[in-house]
A protein has these predicted regions:
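N-terminal functional module of multi-domain proteins
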Residues: 10-109
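Alpha-helical bundle regulatory/interaction domains
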Residues: 75, 81-204, 209, 226, ...
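Conserved hydrophobic/aromatic pocket- or pore-lining residues that grip, position, or stack substrates
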Residues: 176, 216, 240
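Short hydrophobic/aromatic patch on the recognition helix
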Residues: 240, 244, 289-290, 294
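Terminal helix-turn-helix DNA-binding modules in bacterial transcription factors
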Residues: 210-218, 222-223, 227-228, 246-288, ...
């Protein structure tokens, strides 16, 4: 992973800055909008395994993340790791999180809202002043004792964020202001005690399961069982299953089925290899079982997929 670079472009007003990221194994784009004094909205688009940036240990900056596509992982200073799935939202202070993001599916699209609490409190959005909301209390509410708050996907979050991904440019500035106000009012109403928190995983657990993932995806013709992996890597089967799903979003079996089929789809588009050979390469000895699995995932037969995608 590579560090965050200087802005590639910045407008004359200081309203928008664009960062093009070389992540070592992929690329990323971060578009930063200064919506209010002390409040930024950042659009994140990554096709990479992760990204790093310069360390920022300001305990008075609150970071709110929303995952639109893919998965996003963060490592807390305690050493614990937590992961967001599609539609999830997280809140933490900048000083409680390592200056990096990981993307287990090598694809991530989401929005971050950064709030400098002191600056925002000095010049708050008008609606906050009118409602008597003290934005400084958000830190104690959501990040008490260094906690990170996670909210699972729900309709209220979807309502606030979904429209932000398709705002016409001519309306973007007033719309971002409106949506930031809506988000802050929504967070004011959240009852933290009623939100079930996501499991956090230790760094050693995460690194071990990532090694297992690497093993599983390196040779698709092999199909080790969970019990075999558990013995080989000295990890409890329940811990392996739970941690794998927490990182990658699916049980091992379902994840590997989809992974195999996605690899097969690439081969169908990019090569002239026969369907039978492709099935064998990704671990299906029976071509009819491969065809059935392919239809389950891609909703189309392999031969028809190759034809429609203009495969070689």
């Amino acid at each position: 992973m590579k560090e965050m670079s200087l802005p590639t472009t910045r407008d004359s007003e200081g309203y928008c800055a664009l960062y093009k990221m070389d992540c070592g194994d992929g690329l990323g784009l971060m578009t930063v909008y200064q919506v209010y004094p002390g409040i930024q909205v950042i659009y994140n688009d990554f096709e990479a395994a992760g990204c790093e940036w310069e360390e920022n240990l300001d305990r008075d900056i609150l970071e709110i993340n929303h995952c639109r596509e893919g998965r996003e992982g963060s490592r807390l200073l305690s050493g614990s790791c937590l992961y967001l799935g599609e539609g999830d939202l997280s809140i933490h202070t900048m000083d409680n999180c390592a200056p990096e993001m990981s993307f287990p599916l090598r694809h991530y699209r989401g929005i971050s809202v950064l709030i400098n609490l002191k600056m925002a409190a000095e010049a708050p959005p008008e609606i906050l002043s009118e409602s008597g909301i003290d934005i400084l209390k958000f830190k104690e509410k959501f990040c008490h004792d260094g906690n990170c708050f996670i909210m699972r996907a729900k309709d209220e979050i979807e309502h606030i964020f979904s429209e932000l991904y398709s705002v016409p440019e001519c309306l973007q500035r007033p719309y971002l202001k409106l949506k930031v106000q809506e988000l802050l009012l929504f967070l004011c109403m959240v009852d933290v005690s009623k939100e079930k928190q996501r499991t956090q995983y230790t760094s050693p657990q995460v690194e071990l399961v990532k090694e297992i993932h690497k093993r599983l995806t390196a040779n698709l013709q092999e199909r080790p069982t969970i019990e075999e992996l558990s013995k080989e890597y000295l990890i409890n089967t329940a811990t392996l299953k739970d941690t794998f799903k927490g990182i990658y979003g699916q049980p091992i079996g379902a994840y590997m089925k989809e992974y195999r089929i996605r690899q097969a789809a690439d081969l169908l588009r990019q090569t002239q290899v026969s369907i039978a050979e492709i099935a064998s390469q990704i671990g299906y000895e029976n071509q009819s079982k491969f065809a059935s699995a392919f239809r389950d995932i891609m909703k189309i037969a392999p031969a028809e997929y190759r034809k429609q995608s203009g495969g070689k």
